[in-house]
Structure formats: C-alpha cells, structure tokens
Amino acid sequence: MCFSFIMPPAMADILDIWAVDSQIASDGSIPVDFLLPTGIYIQLEVPREATISYIKQMLWKQVHNYPMFNLLMDIDSYMFACVNQTAVYEELEDETRRLCDVRPFLPVLKLVTRSCDPGEKLDSKIGVLIGKGLHEFDSLKDPEVNEFRRKMRKFSEEKILSLVGLSWMDWLKQTYPPEHEPSIPENLEDKLYGGKLIVAVHFENCQDVFSFQVSPNMNPIKVNELAIQKRLTIHGKEDEVSPYDYVLQVSGRVEYVFGDHPLIQFQYIRNCVMNRALPHFILVECCKIKKMYEQEMIAIEAAINRNSSNLPLPLPPKKTRIISHVWENNNPFQIVLVKGNKLNTEETVKVHVRAGLFHGTELLCKTIVSSEVSGKNDHIWNEPLEFDINICDLPRMARLCFAVYAVLDKVKTKKSTKTINPSKYQTIRKAGKVHYPVAWVNTMVFDFKGQLRTGDIILHSWSSFPDELEEMLNPMGTVQTNPYTENATALHVKFPENKKQPYYYPPFDKIIEKAAEIASSDSANVSSRGGKKFLPVLKEILDRDPLSQLCENEMDLIWTLRQDCREIFPQSLPKLLLSIKWNKLEDVAQLQALLQIWPKLPPREALELLDFNYPDQYVREYAVGCLRQMSDEELSQYLLQLVQVLKYEPFLDCALSRFLLERALGNRRIGQFLFWHLRSEVHIPAVSVQFGVILEAYCRGSVGHMKVLSKQVEALNKLKTLNSLIKLNAVKLNRAKGKEAMHTCLKQSAYREALSDLQSPLNPCVILSELYVEKCKYMDSKMKPLWLVYNNKVFGEDSVGVIFKNGDDLRQDMLTLQMLRLMDLLWKEAGLDLRMLPYGCLATGDRSGLIEVVSTSETIADIQLNSSNVAAAAAFNKDALLNWLKEYNSGDDLDRAIEEFTLSCAGYCVASYVLGIGDRHSDNIMVKKTGQLFHIDFGHILGNFKSKFGIKRERVPFILTYDFIHVIQQGKTGNTEKFGRFRQCCEDAYLILRRHGNLFITLFALMLTAGLPELTSVKDIQYLKDSLALGKSEEEALKQFKQKFDEALRESWTTKVNWMAHTVRKDYRS
C-alpha cells in the first residue's frame, strides 16, 4: 500500500522523492544520475530504500557497458558523494545507509575516490551533524575564525587524550553521569515506608524480580550484594559472583546508579519516593559496560589519529614588531565615513548616519550625526567623524555603532518612502522633518587580538530594528555583519592608519602596573573608604533590584567606597561596575586590579555579570570563575541562559565558550543539551558562524557522542518530512484517512529504523525503543503536531509519549518551563514541595522541537465535556473535576490525590501570577489521575494577555475557579481549614520567590537576545519587578499578593465565561 498523499507538482521533484507519496511506493524506484570519475554519465532506476552498498553494486554491473571502464580502479576504491538537503557536500562513507535517509538535494550521486584521509571523513560527518559544512568556515578566510578553530582543535584533542587513560568506571561517570543531590528535603522522610526504601531488582536475561527493603542511606554496591543473596536463596549457588561484578541500571533508561553516594541522594530514587513509585533496577554485568567502554576507546583512538593527521603545519615564527599601546596615544578617536550603498531609498530622499561609541549600554561620548546626502546607488560622504574621547581612554570592549536614517518631510512621508515602514520604528522629529531608521550595524574598535582597527572596512548592515533603541542606535545588536551581502545596505568606513606600528590595548601586566602607579599617588588613597556613616546609605542603594537606575551621585558614592563594597558588600560588584567611568583609563586600571582580590560570588549572583551591561573581558572571566563552583546539575539549570549570552560575546575565543565546552565534554548530559541549544539556532545569520564553530569543537572532543546525536538528527529529519506532508494534505484528507496514511508511513522500514532505539533529545536517559504505531496520531491545531507513542520493552515500564512540533517557536515555552523548574527547586530548598510538573520541552531547529507527553492526564476541558451532555453547561459543573478524581482514586488514594491537587494548584497559581502567564483556558490546564494539576502552552507571558477589540479577555491575575476550590475543600462547602491551608501555601510560595526576585530578573535579562516576541527589551522585564513587588517591603508585598488572590477569587466567574466560550467552540469543531 502506498502513501496516499497527493503532492503539488512543484514539490514532486524533490520533497516526495525521499518522503512518501502517492506516486512512489515504499518499494518503488526513482531515476538517479551517476557521475563517474571518467566523465561518463549514467542514469539508473534505483529503489528509494536501497542501501548505498546495493546501489554501488547495481552501478558497477552497468559500468562494464560504458567507455573507459578499464580506467576505473577496483569497486572498493570508490564511494559516493552528494549534496544533501542542507547544501553540505557529503561523502557517503557509511554504505549501510539507505538512499532515502541520505536525502540528496537532487537525485545525483558522484562516484569519487575513497578518501584515505581520516580527518576529511571526520570533517564530513561533523558537517552533516551540525547542519553546516566545515568548508563554509574555511571559505570565510577570517583570521579570527581560523585562529579559534585551531585553538579549539588543540583543546578538543587534549580532552580526548585525557579520556585514553580513564578506567571504565571513570568513563561511565563522564558518559552517563548519575544525577544526585546531597541535600535531602524535609518532607521526603514522610514518604518512606517506616524509614525504609523498597526497591525492585532483576538480573539481565532473567524474569525474576526481587523486591526488598533497604536503608535510604545504603550505597548501591550493598544493593547489588542483597540482590545476589536473594538470587542465591531462590536458585541456589551458581558461579562465584561478586557485587562488584555488576552495576545498577535504572529499568528502561540509560541511567546508572553507582558510587559511594547514599541511595536517597540519587535523583531517580528521590523522584520515585516523591511520586510513591517503586524504584526498579536491572543488575547489568560490568563486562557489558566494559565492552561499551572499549568500543568508544577504539573510536577515540581513531579520532586522535584523525585530528593529528589533519592538523595544519605550524606557521613560522613572525619577526617581533615594535608595538605601541593605545594608552600612549592622546589623540581624539576619529574615523572617516566614506560612503554607503544599497540604501533602498528613493533618489531624492536625503540620508544621514548616526554613530556612537558604547561600552555595554553606556555611551562613552556624545553621538555624532553626519551630514545629509542623497544619491541613486552610492551615497558619498567622505566625512571625518571625530568623537569626544581620546584613543587612550577607549576601553578594550568598546563598540562602534552606526544607524542609517532617511530624512523625510512630515507632510511627504507617505509619498517619499520606498520601503520604509515609518510606524514600525522609533523616529526622531526635528525641524519639521522626520528621521526614519533604514539600517544599523556595529563593529568592535579593537580586533580579536586587541589591535586598534585600521584601514578600510565594509560593514554590511541589518534592516530589522529592536523596539527600544539607545540614542537611536542598537548597541545590544550583534557585531557580526550581515552575511547576505547581495541586498544588505553597506557602509564604507575608514579607520585611521598608523604607519609606524600598530596600536594595541595594553596587556594585563601593564594594566596592573598602571593601577599600582595610581595607587601609590597621594590622591588615590584618600577616598576608597567612607566610614560607618555612609554604610546605611550604601546598603540601601546596593539592595535595589537590577532594574533600578542609579543617579550620578549614587554612582560616585559607590565608586568612592569601592573598598568598603569589596570587604562588606561583595555582592555589590554589578552596581560598582555600572558606577565606573569606562571612558577613563585610570578608573579602568584600578578596577581591574581590584577585581583580582574581589571575593568569589555565589554562582547565582555571578550570572548577572554575564549580562550585556558588563562586556569587559576580565569581568566576564571573573564571572566564569565563579560559575566553576556550580555542580553539573546546577549548571544544567541555567544552560539555556548561558548559551544565549554567548551572543553578547564579541569574539569567538572567550572564557564562557571554553567553560561551556569544558563542562559539556566532561558530562554527556550537558553536552547533549548544549548541542541542541546551539544547533537549534545555527540557522540564524548573526550567530551561524559562532555557534557553528563551537559545535564543531564539541564534536571533535566527543566523537563517541556523535553517533547518538546523528541518530537523533536523522529521526527529527524524518519527523519534519512527515509533518510537512501531513500539513500539505490535511485539507484533502479526512482525519481517519490522514491518520491511516501517517501509520503507513511510520511502518515503512526507513522510518521504523530511524525512529527506533534512540536516546530521547528531551532526556538522554530515556530510550525511545519502538513506536506504538497504532497509538500515534497528528493533532488538530494549525501546525499539525505529531503525537508519537513508544513502547518500552522493559518490564513494568509505561509507554513514553513525545510531541513533535514543526512551525512553532518553542523557545518561549522552554524559558517558561525552566522558570517553573527553578521555582520548584527554590521552594524545595525552603522545605515546600508544591508538586510541580514542568515537563520536558526542547527546541531542535528553526521553529521546530519536541515536547514531553505527561502520561495519565487530561485537560480540564475534556474532563468537563465528558461530564455533561451540553457543552455550554460543562464549564459550570463544579462537581466534574472532583468526580473525575474519585473515578480513579478511592480511600487514602483519593485523599492523596486531593493533596496533590491542592499543592500543585497553589504552585501554578503563584507561578502564573509572577510570570504573567496568559491565554489560560480549560484546554491548557491539565490534571493527572493522581491529582497533580499543571499548565501547558506558554505562548503569552510577562502580562501579555490576549485581547479582542482592545478589551482584555483575561481579567484575573491567575486561575482560581470554584471547581478548583471544590476539590481543595474535598467537596465540602464549609471546609475553611483546607482552603485556609491552600491560601497559606500560596502566600508562603510567593514570599519565597520574592526573596529570589533578582535571580528571576537576571535570567530574563540574559534572554533578551533570544528574539522572543514577548521579551525584546528591559521594559518587558518590568512586569516581574511589579509582580514580585521588589520595590516594597515584605509586608507591603504580601498585602499586594493577598489583594490579587481575592481578585482572582472574586472575578473567577469571568474565567468560567471564557471557558464556556472555549468549550462551545471546541465542541462545535469536533
């Protein structure tokens, strides 16, 4: 049976050749063009699911009939090459792959001599894996890119060499690191069975399951011993075995429990206890682990040979040149604005350029505006722009920002604009004219080696402006130029030449010398301390949240009392850095010296120093030094932000990129998420090279992980193809036929193999073993997400569900769910477990990704609909939810379910209020059969509530309906004790989050470059400051929250009306 989708003619040539369509059956053939080394061209009909090896044999049978066959070598001397779907030249070394999995851009295969260079083979594999050919980096001929790649290749090789000496146990710790947490929540002991754990263990290839009670403080090797004793008791003595011959593996997962940590510290066991589930283990023989280890060592040794064979020869030593430091140059900084072209404005429109020097968001001197010129193609200025700052005072990370503006008469704006949308961007109104932004571009004043830029440069600009601009410039924008040069506005700028010798920013030792020189002078020692009388004032300033602005006097006070800040208030460092005059070399030198003796900050506080406001190289190195104190689990919590702030780094080689690579290469779990966070954005032009070379470095240092990641990439490509076909044909096919066609596709061998036995990108511990095709479906929403269900082959394990989305940006969902996980962590640290359920979500590409399915759960809408015959009345049935819980729980289980509901409802009430989560209807609030309530779909956050005709549809600060209260009160109207406890939980949870308000503001600020539609400027983060009442006392803040709680309760009828409308629409569509 062939796939019954009908493709449009335009797609039939490419897409459905490799996908599944109505014209080519799964066992059908397609015409493929073959190009031989002799120049001969052959076309053959080839089965689309044939392996590369089979196709080569087919071709070889035919080449005998063509001229110059005698010039060809043996068949094994050749392999095929093609251009794949990502425009990467790929050599098909692995001949077990199917043609439909290779998916050439066009059905053309070139026969090439098999490469003997193992380095080239690795390069080809890396290019395919990261979705960007390494030849693209070579073709840039960029000295910085080449230097970084060379250093990272050496760095990766050193990491690989360090693996060679590892024991198999050390390798296991690094490859499959166990997740554990030393601190134990207070309420965990209440959920043990008389202070004991019950665990289930079975041996591989054995159906017997042994359950026994153990102490939560027992270590894993003791569990091995007890399991062996149980087996001996039942089956008698067999071969002599030792508990050290086995390792505990979590059933159904690639997760191992080993080492000296007590059982209760392992995350898996802790989760089982919290969820009242039975921890289930398999005793795996160590020899099996050793075999995996040996296979990876073989791959590692091959990689060492590959890397070393492909390393470029070292360059001959350069002659030592006399260099000058910029601190010796007291001349004003100036450039020449030569010309601009491709401005995309009418010939009569006048254009000017604004230029400014920034350090972070601080303007170092007044902006400069060029004269106004007009022109058809080129706009000629040849105009010197002199800035009010001397070269010696330029900080190392100074950036030069340009913006091109069209100058239009107010009355002629509509007729004069060619492509400008005046209403979209901020404008300057002056002297009866309006200045509209056309393009912007930024560049660093010093290059990656610290040399002051010289000579002519062409800056290809960007045309999309952010909502909020500084001085009508975009200092937070990238310093990379637009790679799409063909249509981009280009500015020709000339930096001053220095004919004698280049100017460099002083090295670190010169900076410290300068600071010592200043410190020895009488004037410097007068005012570094202020005495006790200033400390209360200083403390009040330093206690403010990160969004609070400092006035000039406050900044002077902080700088004056910098020694007091270091000794008494080390957490004041961010505010001290905002108080320094970065356009004054003396202050900068003193700060760098002070930074060397500044106490290390806790990692959570140091995160703020990676914000855009702190671009200084040594500050960021200090921040990374603080982050090194983080455990792997804590680092994973903030990895999303740490990847985003790479965009703030102006140069490729920086402390942060090295730190992330180092930790990723030391922990494969971190490595997997770093890989996907980078790869999901590698298509973005501004970061394509930066993220691409970091991905290359990770792959070179973790060749053993490449096979796992390649399997995931292949599976996601298959899902994307399937989803595209479903969307193309959803209108033509009814749901039943569409689902049948989907199942037909999934049953094909190419899809079945690609989508089976892979580690889940959402969680590397989870194995997606075998699709349960009959339960797979696509959903009704616009983008037709794929709902996939996997059977778990291991005894006693539930099925695993994942949703694949293609066409929706999941990064905002990722951010919101990360915040929910952090809230859960902070509450647990304070002894409050609110049973949160932040499910997995991962962006894996351009508007595509995966979402974890929470098993045994239903939406509020479905629960209500199933309890009523009339859709309009369903939303007002307050008994529906409680009755549903009673259907699945009784007795003590029902009491526990209501407790779970009460706690989780409190958690999500507070979380949705603090984060400003909008669009809350009955289809994006769900409940598990065990009682846990949780929210899904976070398309609107930070108070961006949906509105219609200018009227907000959501009037309540958070969702608290009477059917929720009915469950909390156990169905008893007068049960004020239960409701009072619920309210107290909400208030406690709110105050706990408020105490960590600065952390939430910092994390959102670090995401400003992510390009999320509802997080584009600092103004968006202001919502958090307001919801957490950070400018008020704790009493005032609690009073504000109590008012919001009462408002949610009082206005809950409006929620029910919205839910009724939603339920009626849903019922009508179904």
From Swiss-Prot:
Primary residence: cytoplasm
Modified residues (Phosphoserine): S324, S1070
Pathways per UniProt: Phospholipid metabolism; phosphatidylinositol phosphate biosynthesis
MF terms in GO: 1-phosphatidylinositol-3-kinase activity; 1-phosphatidylinositol-4,5-bisphosphate 3-kinase activity; 1-phosphatidylinositol-4-phosphate 3-kinase activity; ATP binding; insulin receptor substrate binding; protein serine kinase activity
Biological process terms in GO annotation: angiogenesis involved in wound healing; autophagy; cell migration; cell surface receptor protein tyrosine kinase signaling pathway; chemotaxis; embryonic cleavage; endocytosis; endothelial cell proliferation
Region (G-loop): 778-784
SMART domains associated with the record: PI3K_C2, PI3K_p85B, PI3K_rbd, PI3Ka, PI3Kc
Its EC number(s): 2.7.1.153, 2.7.11.1
Keyword terms, alphabetized: ATP-binding, Autophagy, Cell adhesion, Cytoplasm, Endocytosis, Kinase, Lipid metabolism, Nucleotide-binding, Nucleus, Phosphoprotein, Transferase
Region (Catalytic loop): 916-924
Residue span(s) of domain PI3K-ABD: 26-115
Residue ranges of every copy of the PI3K/PI4K catalytic domain listed in the record: 772-1053
Processing and modification events after translation: Autophosphorylation at Ser-1070 negatively regulates the phosphatidylinositol-4,5-bisphosphate 3-kinase activity.
Localization annotation: Cytoplasm; Nucleus
Catalytic reaction annotation: a 1,2-diacyl-sn-glycero-3-phospho-(1D-myo-inositol-4,5-bisphosphate) + ATP = a 1,2-diacyl-sn-glycero-3-phospho-(1D-myo-inositol-3,4,5-trisphosphate) + ADP + H(+); 1-octadecanoyl-2-(5Z,8Z,11Z,14Z)-eicosatetraenoyl-sn-glycero-3-phospho-1D-myo-inositol 4,5-bisphosphate + ATP = 1-octadecanoyl-2-(5Z,8Z,11Z,14Z-eicosatetraenoyl)-sn-glycero-3-phospho-(1D-myo-inositol 3,4,5-triphosphate) + ADP + H(+); L-seryl-[protein] + ATP = O-phospho-L-seryl-[protein] + ADP + H(+)
Domain PIK helical, residue spans: 524-701
InterPro entries named in the record: ARM-type_fold, C2_domain_sf, Kinase-like_dom_sf, PI3/4_kinase_cat_dom, PI3/4_kinase_cat_sf, PI3/4_kinase_CS, PI3K-type_C2_dom, PI3K_ABD
Domain C2 PI3K-type, first and last residues per copy: 327-496
Domain named PI3K-RBD: residues: 194-285
Tissue: Expressed ubiquitously.
Domain remark text: The inhibitory interactions with PIK3R1 are mediated by the PI3K-ABD domain and the C2 PI3K-type domain with the iSH2 (inter-SH2) region of PIK3R1; the C2 PI3K-type domain, the PI3K helical domain, and the PI3K/PI4K kinase domain with the nSH2 (N-terminal SH2) region of PIK3R1; and the PI3K/PI4K kinase domain with the cSH2 (C-terminal SH2) region of PIK3R1. The inhibitory interaction between the PI3K-ABD domain and the C2 PI3K-type domain with the iSH2 (inter-SH2) region of PIK3R1 is weak. The nuclear localization signal (NLS) is required for its function in cell survival.
Physiological role: Phosphoinositide-3-kinase (PI3K) phosphorylates phosphatidylinositol derivatives at position 3 of the inositol ring to produce 3-phosphoinositides. Uses ATP and PtdIns(4,5)P2 (phosphatidylinositol 4,5-bisphosphate) to generate phosphatidylinositol 3,4,5-trisphosphate (PIP3). PIP3 plays a key role by recruiting PH domain-containing proteins to the membrane, including AKT1 and PDPK1, activating signaling cascades involved in cell growth, survival, proliferation, motility and morphology.
Family: Belongs to the PI3/PI4-kinase family.
Quaternary assembly: Heterodimer of a catalytic subunit PIK3CB and a p85 regulatory subunit (PIK3R1, PIK3R2 or PIK3R3). Interaction with PIK3R2 is required for nuclear localization and nuclear export. Part of a complex with PIK3R1 and PTEN. Binding to PTEN may antagonize the lipid kinase activity under normal growth conditions. Part of a complex involved in autophagosome formation composed of PIK3C3 and PIK3R4. Interacts with BECN1, ATG14 and RAB5A.
Protein name (Swiss-Prot/TrEMBL): Phosphatidylinositol 4,5-bisphosphate 3-kinase catalytic subunit beta isoform
